[in-house]
Amino acid sequence: MKALLASLLESSLNSFQKLSLTHCYAIKCGSISDIYVSNRILDSYIKFGFLGYANMLFDEMPKRDSVSWNTMISGYTSCGKLEDAWCLFTCMKRSGSDVDGYSFSRLLKGIASVKRFDLGEQVHGLVIKGGYECNVYVGSSLVDMYAKCERVEDAFEAFKEISEPNSVSWNALIAGFVQVRDIKTAFWLLGLMEMKAAVTMDAGTFAPLLTLLDDPMFCNLLKQVHAKVLKLGLQHEITICNAMISSYADCGSVSDAKRVFDGLGGSKDLISWNSMIAGFSKHELKESAFELFIQMQRHWVETDIYTYTGLLSACSGEEHQIFGKSLHGMVIKKGLEQVTSATNALISMYIQFPTGTMEDALSLFESLKSKDLISWNSIITGFAQKGLSEDAVKFFSYLRSSEIKVDDYAFSALLRSCSDLATLQLGQQIHALATKSGFVSNEFVISSLIVMYSKCGIIESARKCFQQISSKHSTVAWNAMILGYAQHGLGQVSLDLFSQMCNQNVKLDHVTFTAILTACSHTGLIQEGLELLNLMEPVYKIQPRMEHYAAAVDLLGRAGLVNKAKELIESMPLNPDPMVLKTFLGVCRACGEIEMATQVANHLLEIEPEDHFTYVSLSHMYSDLKKWEEKASVKKMMKERGVKKVPGWSWIEIRNQVKAFNAEDRSNPLCQDIYMMIKDLTQEMQWLDSDNGVDADSLHA
């Protein structure tokens, strides 16, 4: 009879219905009283995830042994019900059943999953009392528990108590030091493990270590790890390869990531595809990301939420709007529109569209039922980026009144709005709120405060914020301070700060050079600026981007060196983008190089026929030259092409209220009196400065 039941249970492993029938048969024939049979059925219920049925059977069992108790404890911990598992463990001890190594291991696994260090210490005491601290399975579980609770010193002590640590013990300890990002100790342990002939390194050893190597400075170390993986013949382990794809992409070596990806052949899983797409997107290789997605479709690879979030982050340019909207349709078709991370990615995508408005992003935000902090931060940042600073402030207030706790990112976005509005009083209030909320030492909040005070004209307060930062190696804070001095015409101070940055080994990035080139441009430090541009790649290992060339063109233009600016553009390794050309157009116009300006403008109209900037620049240039027919021709062209000038807005803070207005705004009921006052002020300014030869056309209210 026992053999028949064993056979029936074996055939029930993949069918809950068969398991139920086998259970009924065991009751009917009286075999359910056999503890072996009961334990087998109990274990099967647990494996199917039917904890309720398992619990009823456990309560009805006339006899229970340690296997019965351990099976139920394992079931509760697997379902995340640690309190029930702990209660059952206590009952097990009281019942007189033997608590063994398996009991401790299963309980410690549950404690590790929820990081209940307090319970872990109690169990450790019982382990010592029971004499199991040298047991490799219990010891490994203790190491894992302490490691996941980020108590790596305790994990190391527990590890040293194990008489013969195995791969699981070593992997748990290494993973603990990975979790606290102690790269030095983690790799030291890897070296020790490598010297142990009896211990085998596997995917559990390398996969966590690879997650640490997420910066270009670790590229050589990553290649060493890759060599070890090849030496051990683990190059086809999917977990290791997926981690390696992500690490190579994070280190900036996308070609190596693609090589690992291609080496997987037909054994790629969904994580492999998603990791490669994310790597391409991160490094602005958008077309490669889209092509890989198309390959996924050809290979009938099922997509998931991570596929779409990786792709949506690449749909930021105007040329990718159609593809981005198609992805939006796929997200809806998949039924993922109420998945918060998917909607957050869609909100960010619509915000980043250059010609887009906030309407689509706001509609998505409002339709999302379970908004998280990223949702709020995205919409606040979107308003700030689009210049809708009042809306950013309003939504920050809504966030504060919700149950979600405000973080440093929200404060940074709001302070950016204050910077754009140049509302000092509001900025100071947010500064006080950030201090009260404990974010005043955060590098991103500090950087935003530096920008805000700089734009509000209080460079001394910006400097005080910079001096208060806890991390003296914060690149974003140094960049903000350099740019702040640049905006105040203190180029030499910016250069001194740049030198300090280099001497203190603060990491330089693209923004650093944009800031320092801007500083040189604003203060006429031509030689210094050009020298820095030329040294970027050979000395600082940073390849110049379009924004750096645009800053250098502006630098030469401000000095009246139009031909030098033209030569610089012609010597660029890549074709100049619209940003560089628009900068050069401004230079030509300011220096009176009308013919050259017209050529640049015509080229811009070919590549960006819908952008209003070029039309407006041409119109103003012809107006300055009093060429009214040409100006009328530009206006006509705009009308025919449906191009409208985006009005520029200005703000002023009066009695704690922000007033917004644009050029020739007549919506204010007092506009007649306002324009009369402007006229009187303009006439008075002309009269006062007539001796200095100030051109009336240069006076703007």
Swiss-Prot record:
GO terms for molecular function: RNA binding. One of its GO terms (biological process) is RNA modification. Gene3D superfamilies: Tetratricopeptide repeat domain. InterPro entries: E_motif (IPR046848), Pentatricopeptide_rpt (IPR002885), PPR_At4g14850-like_plant (IPR046960), TPR-like_helical_dom_sf (IPR011990). PPR repeats lie at residues 34-64, 65-99, 100-134, 135-165, 166-200, 202-236, 237-267, 269-303, 304-338, 339-371, 372-406, 407-441, 442-472, 474-508, 509-539, 545-575. The keyword Aminoacyl-tRNA synthetase does not apply. Coiled coil: none annotated. Residues 580-655 are annotated as: Type E motif. The keyword Repeat applies. SUPFAM superfamilies: TPR-like (SSF48452). Residues 656-686 are annotated as: Type E(+) motif. Keywords: Repeat. NCBIfam families: PPR. Belongs to the PPR family. PCMP-E subfamily. PANTHER family: OS07G0578800 PROTEIN-RELATED, OS08G0340900 PROTEIN. This is Putative pentatricopeptide repeat-containing protein At3g25970.
